[in-house]
UniProtKB/Swiss-Prot annotation:
It comes from Bacillus cereus (strain ZK / E33L). This protein is involved in the repair of mismatches in DNA. It is possible that it carries out the mismatch recognition step. This protein has a weak ATPase activity. The keyword DNA-binding applies. Gene3D superfamilies: 1.10.1420.10, DNA repair protein MutS, domain I (3.40.1170.10), MutS, connector domain (3.30.420.110), P-loop containing nucleotide triphosphate hydrolases (3.40.50.300). It holds the Pfam family MutS_I. One of its GO terms (cellular component) is cytosol. It comes from the Bacteria. GO terms for biological process: mismatch repair. This is DNA mismatch repair protein MutS. GO terms for molecular function: ATP binding; ATP-dependent DNA damage sensor activity; damaged DNA binding; mismatched DNA binding. Belongs to the DNA mismatch repair MutS family. The gene is mutS. HAMAP family: MutS. ATP binds at G607, P608, N609, M610, S611, G612, K613, S614. SUPFAM superfamilies: DNA repair protein MutS, domain I (SSF55271), DNA repair protein MutS, domain II (SSF53150), DNA repair protein MutS, domain III (SSF48334), P-loop containing nucleoside triphosphate hydrolases (SSF52540).
């Protein structure tokens, strides 16, 4: 390294401690990057890559950005998942001996960004720290540096469970120790697209012990310690806004796995990854940024405690029933800025005068909000606002100190009001009167010299001066002015009197700017004392904002308050999919009931493609989630249990999500539900088994249905195209067939989108293909193939095998009874061997042997016609036997 110049040596020494970050190295008015950083940054930021002599034989790659524009470039890099170390000059270059001393003052990472376009005002920006213990458990600690919020929990499940919880936090960066499993890190980066950082220190840093007073478990303290040490190491500044650590347990909330959250589109759509079109988009009527963040947190973790849910529902009902209270609250909330993040900026020392003005305007609304809520006859409301301090003394302090329209920079002056500080008032008097004297001097000199164009001006280099154009120089009295500067068309002069006043004015203005800055920083320290009270207020206001948001959307969309029951029953009358209904924007939406009594666990749903089966299934899940976050639901009546978990396996359908999963993913998701669901869970399986061959898929689907029915007992909606499975209703007493209805008119299918009892008679797949405008020739061919396949159908009816309790762990394979129906041909149709082989999917004996074509008389043809019209799925076994006996008797008659 000795071959490099001293400055490059300094750069390399600093860079050695920040190998995983871009080093923004301050050189005068620029931040420069060198070597590999320069090459990569030039590409990512689309800026010019150049080079410079660094003392070695080869020139060093270099790029740079102006310091005043650095914020934008840093945001671009962090948005892409990179880290940026900001290295500043920490001594005055004019007084430095040798190379100017430089230090990294902040490491900016995806999880520690405080502001910028990467920070959504209605989303937290969590940094997570994960600690793995020898017994297989994990501790997960999270911090949002923008709000000061800290949480920690202990996790004991599989890696998938860990991923679920990390996903729920929405963290963009995760901190682990240097020995963390590489395989697990790969899962984190591949599944959740997170930035990985390392920190081995786990002791709680000095000065932050008070934040973990309520945390006694050693595992949790280690995770929090890792988190805090990383934050201190990267931020290198005051963390006074950090809030006491909140412990939570995952079993306090409804569990929804990562895939289910995506399938249900709770907070973002699968196709665009945007909020618009999600359930969050529909429910978000919050008026404050912090309310929006709390809403998202509630949606990520629905409650499972019946009493807590009912508290929220009662509060929402209060707002629904009191229009004037709700509207008045909304108007006041509009004027409340982001108290949490304002408190964070105060602690970090980057708050400006406009921020404090926003804080004051927010606090002005608080007394009226608290008073209105205190008048409610509601225990939850009283408990919510208990201990909330309106901070009236802070409001008064800010009111008499900060100007109404302050500049953005705190170094430009004009921040502090007149009357706040006596010395400042004196300086302002001198400055103001001095400028008045300048104006009077200009008028007097014009009168004395008779030069109307004479003017007194000012610039930073020469100070105040008297300017006379060259055309008027002859009118000046000899020796009146002292020449200062010559211009092309004018001369500039000064006088002793002007210089004296200049000194007074400039000293006053400099002192004004400096004193205002000092007063502002002192004021900022006074505001710091109020941070805990402001954070408590923020939580109260956020919760009220979410509850009014629920009330507003419930009123607008005609939702109903759900009744929670301890029984395992679902009663939803005229239920709707809330997002689909909203997107239809006034067009007719067909509501559907979902009535599952205590002893009814499985709905087996059949029906045409694109008829709305998947929408119906999602509808139930969304109604459940809405109920358990405390919101009214889209129905005319709803009685619901409290579910502990939701599992979904929903593929591409109904234009709600995109992409198609592999069969392996399908089976893994099914396994997850089967392994973890309880009788208090909700399972939604859409077309399980479609990713493999017909028989394999049907067998797996039946086995899964039977297992859920017999062993789990979870409320389940199971849609299928395997109409053969509808016979399970006869052997599974807690399973019911339902279908989505459709009718044919003039050869076209009309989807009624209505759920009805019983099984569907057909799938209308070819009709859907017609709707998709496939070629007519292809449609015609499909109809030919369908007709021939229907003529050589093979029905598999597995025997129902009762499994004793002590035998449940053994694998039991039902013995199938195979009933082969020989094809019956009415018309003479020639099909060569090759075509027959292609069309037969049901074994070699059908494709290798030519069947003798029977000759039917008129009576046999009539009976065959009657058989075709019989709907066996609507008949009991006894009715089917009687019908078969009647037809057989008819054929035997002479």
């Amino acid at each position: 390294m000795t071959q490099y110049t001293p400055m490059i040596q300094q750069y390399l020494k600093v860079k050695a401690d920040y190998q995983d970050a871009f080093l923004f190295f301050r050189l005068g008015d620029f931040y420069e990057m060198f070597f590999e950083d320069a090459v990569k940054a030039a590409h990512e930021l689309e800026i010019t890559l150049t080079s410079r002599d660094g003392g070695s034989s080869e020139r060093i790659p270099m790029c740079g950005v102006p310091y005043h524009a650095a914020k934008n470039y840093i945001e671009q890099l962090v948005e892409k998942g990179y880290k940026v170390a900001v290295c500043e000059q920490v001594e005055d270059p004019k007084t430095a001996k040798g190379v100017v001393r430089r230090e990294v003052v902040q490491l900016i990472t995806p999880g520690t960004m405080m502001e910028g376009r990467t920070i959504d005002e209605k989303e937290n920006n969590f940094l997570a720290a994960l600690t793995h213990f020898e017994d297989g458990s994990y501790a997960l600690a999270c911090n949002d540096l923008t709000t000061g919020q800290n949480t920690v929990t202990l996790l004991t499940g599989s890696v998938e469970d860990i991923l679920l919880e990390v996903y729920a936090t929405g963290s963009k960066e995760i901190v682990v120790d240097s020995s963390f499993s590489k395989d697990e890190l790969n899962k984190l980066t591949e599944t959740l697209k997170m930035t990985i950082s390392y920190e081995d220190a786990t002791a709680i840093p000095e000065g932050l012990e008070h934040l973990v007073k309520n945390v006694s478990q050693a595992k949790l303290i280690k995770a929090v310690g890792r988190l805090f040490n990383y934050v201190i190491r990267t931020q290198k500044r005051s963390l006074d806004h950090l809030q006491p650590v909140e412990i939570y347990y995952t079993n306090q909330f409804m569990k929804i796995d990562v895939h289910s959250k995506r399938n249900l589109e709770l907070t973002e759509t699968l196709r665009t990854k945007e909020k618009t079109g999600s359930l969050l988009w529909l429910l978000d009527k919050t008026k404050t940024a912090m309310g929006g963040r709390m809403l998202k947190q509630w949606m990520e973790r629905p409650l499972i405690q019946k009493e807590r849910i009912e508290e929220r529902l009662e509060m929402v009902e209060t707002f629904v029933n009191d229009y004037f209270l709700r509207e008045d609250l909304k108007e006041k909330l509009k004027e409340v800025y982001d108290l949490e993040r304002l408190a964070g900026k105060v602690a970090f020392g980057n708050v400006n005068a406009r921020d404090l003005l926003q804080l004051r305007r927010s606090l002005l609304q608080v007394p009226a909000i608290l008073e209105a809520i205190s008048l409610l006859d509601n225990a939850y409301a009283a408990r919510l606002i208990q201990g909330a301090d309106p901070c009236e003394s802070l409001t008064e302090l800010l009111g008499r100190s900060i100007q109404e329209n302050p500049p953005l920079s705190i170094k430009d002056g004009d921040i502090i009001k007149d009357g706040y500080n006596d010395k400042l008032d004196q300086y302002r008097y001198v400055s103001k009167n001095g400028k008045t004297w300048i104006a009077e001097l200009e008028k007097r000199e014009r009168d004395i010299t008779g030069i109307k164009s004479l003017k007194i001006g000012y610039n930073r280099i020469f100070g105040y001066y008297i300017e006379v154009t060259k055309a008027n120089l002859g009118a000046l009295p000899e020796g009146r002015y002292e020449r200062k500067q010559t211009l092309a068309n004018a001369e500039r002069f000064i006088t002793d009197e002007l210089k004296e006043k200049e000194t007074l004015i400039l000293e006053a203005e400099e002192k004004i700017v400096q004193l205002e800055y000092d007063l502002f920083t002192a004021l900022r320290e006074e505001v710091k004392v109020f941070i805990p009270k402001l954070q408590h207020l923020a939580k109260v206001i956020s919760e009220l904002d979410v509850l009014q948001s629920f009330a507003t959307v419930s009123e607008e969309e005609q939702f109903v308050k759900p009744v929670l029951t301890t029984k395992r029953e679902i009663f939803i009358k005229d239920g709707r999919h809330p997002v689909v209904e909203k997107v239809l924007n006034g067009k007719l939406y067909v509501p559907n009931d979902c009535i599952m009594p205590e002893k009814m666990d499985v709905f087996l749903i059949t029906g045409p493609n694109m008829s709305g089966k998947s929408t119906y299934m999602r509808q139930l899940a969304l109604v459940t989630v809405m109920s358990q976050i405390g919101c009214f639901v889209p129905a005319t009546e709803a009685v619901l249990p409290v579910f502990d978990q939701i599992f979904t396996r929903i593929g591409a359908a109904d234009d709600l999500i995109s992409g198609q999963s592999t069969f392996m993913v399908e089976m893994l998701e099914a396994k997850n539900a089967i392994a973890n669901a309880s009788e208090r869970s909700l399972i939604l399986f859409d077309e399980i088994g479609r990713g493999t061959s017909t028989y394999d898929g049907m067998a797996l689907a039946q086995a899964i249905i039977e297992h859920i029915h017999d062993q789990i007992g979870a409320k389940t909606l199971f849609s299928t195209h395997y109409h053969e499975l509808t016979v399970l209703e006869d052997s599974l007493d807690q399973l019911k067939n339902v279908h989505v209805s459709a009718i044919e008119e003039n050869g076209k299918v009309v989807f009624l989108h209505k759920i009805q009892d019983g099984a569907a008679d057909k799938s209308y797949g070819i009709h859907v293909a017609q709707l998709a405008e496939l070629p007519d020739s292809l449609i015609a061919r499909a109809k030919e193939v369908l007709a021939q396949l229907e003529g050589q159908e093979e029905i598999i009816i597995p025997k129902r095998v009762e499994v004793k309790a002590q035998e449940q762990e053994q694998e039991v394979i039902p013995e199938p009874i195979v009933v082969k129906e020989e094809p019956v041909e009415i018309e003479e149709t020639k099909v060569d061997n090759e075509e027959e082989s292609q069309l037969s999917f049901f074994g070699a004996e059908h494709s290798s042997k030519k069947q003798d074509k029977p000759v039917l008389d008129a009576k046999e043809t009539a009976v065959l016609s009657q058989i075709k019209k019989i709907d066996l799925l609507d008949m009991t076994p006894l009715e089917a036997m009687n019908e078969l006996y009647r037809l057989q008797k008819k054929l035997k008659k002479g």
